[in-house]
């Protein structure tokens, strides 16, 4: 079919595509936690950015509403950042060992 380098490159591209698809599925199904206020507010979020659980320490219910809202927003943002870090790590692992052309950068 393909000779030498081109055939090898096609096999590598197919392997990379399979690895990336597997990594994307793992990311979509993973759960990460975001926290704020030293763990007083916790958010459990999936890799699809769906919030599964919001946990608020009872001690915060007597505090002002604005502070609680800020802590919830910070915990959500922390969870999103945790997903992004994990996503980059998994995608980098999916392409590890692939001989990509010099200067080629993956879009993640």
UniProtKB/Swiss-Prot annotation:
Family listed: Belongs to the YbaB/EbfC family.
Record's keyword annotation contains Transmembrane helix: no
Protein role: Binds to DNA and alters its conformation. May be involved in regulation of gene expression, nucleoid organization and DNA protection.
Biased composition (Polar residues): 11-22
Assembly mode: Homodimer.
GO molecular function, one term: DNA binding
Primary localization: cytoplasm
Region (Disordered): 1-22
UniProt xrefs under NCBIfam families: DNA_YbaB_EbfC (TIGR00103)
HAMAP family in alphabetical order: DNA_YbaB_EbfC
Signal peptide: none
Keyword field: Cytoplasm, DNA-binding
Species whose genome carries this gene: Marinomonas sp. (strain MWYL1)
Entries under Pfam families matching the protein: YbaB_DNA_bd
Cited InterPro entries: YbaB-like_sf (IPR036894), YbaB/EbfC (IPR004401)
SUPFAM superfamilies given in the database record: YbaB-like
Gene Ontology cellular-component annotations: bacterial nucleoid; cytosol
PANTHER family found in the cross-reference section: NUCLEOID-ASSOCIATED PROTEIN YBAB
Protein's name according to its UniProt entry: Nucleoid-associated protein Mmwyl1_2533
Annotated compartments: Cytoplasm, Nucleoid
